[in-house]
């Protein structure tokens, strides 16, 4: 009874390793499939929420642009 328990434990550990690493990026795979089909409803449009921030002035935006131009 010990051998099947050990084998199941090893199998679970070996299945957990690729899902926790950055090499197995399930989010990137899903994004690639979504971009392949090009459906607008499935694309991430959250970045539009940050385009109009009333607390930022033109001077602030210019300063941010200067800081981030090398990225």
Curated annotation (Swiss-Prot):
Tissue/organ expression? Expressed by the venom gland.
Q: Does the keyword NAD apply?
A: no
Report keywords, A-Z.
Amidation, Antimicrobial, Antiviral protein, Secreted, Signal
GO process terms (BP): regulation of defense response to virus
Q: Which residues cross the membrane?
A: none
Q: Keyword Signal, does the record have it?
A: yes
Check the UniProt entry and state the signal peptide residues, or none.
Answer: 1-23
Which residues are processed away as propeptide to yield the mature protein? 41-71
Locations listed in the record? Secreted
| Family assignment from sequence similarity | Belongs to the non-disulfide-bridged peptide (NDBP) superfamily. Short antimicrobial peptide (group 4) family.
As for what it does, the entry says: Antimicrobial peptide.
Q: What is the recorded name of this protein? A: Peptide Ctri10261
């Amino acid at each position: 009874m010990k051998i099947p328990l050990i084998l199941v434990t090893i199998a679970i550990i070996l299945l957990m390793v690729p899902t926790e690493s950055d090499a197995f990026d399930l989010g990137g795979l899903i994004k690639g499939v979504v971009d392949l089909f090009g459906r607008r409803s499935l694309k991430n449009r959250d970045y539009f929420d940050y385009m109009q921030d009333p607390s930022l002035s033109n001077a602030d935006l210019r300063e941010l642009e200067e800081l981030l131009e090398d990225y």
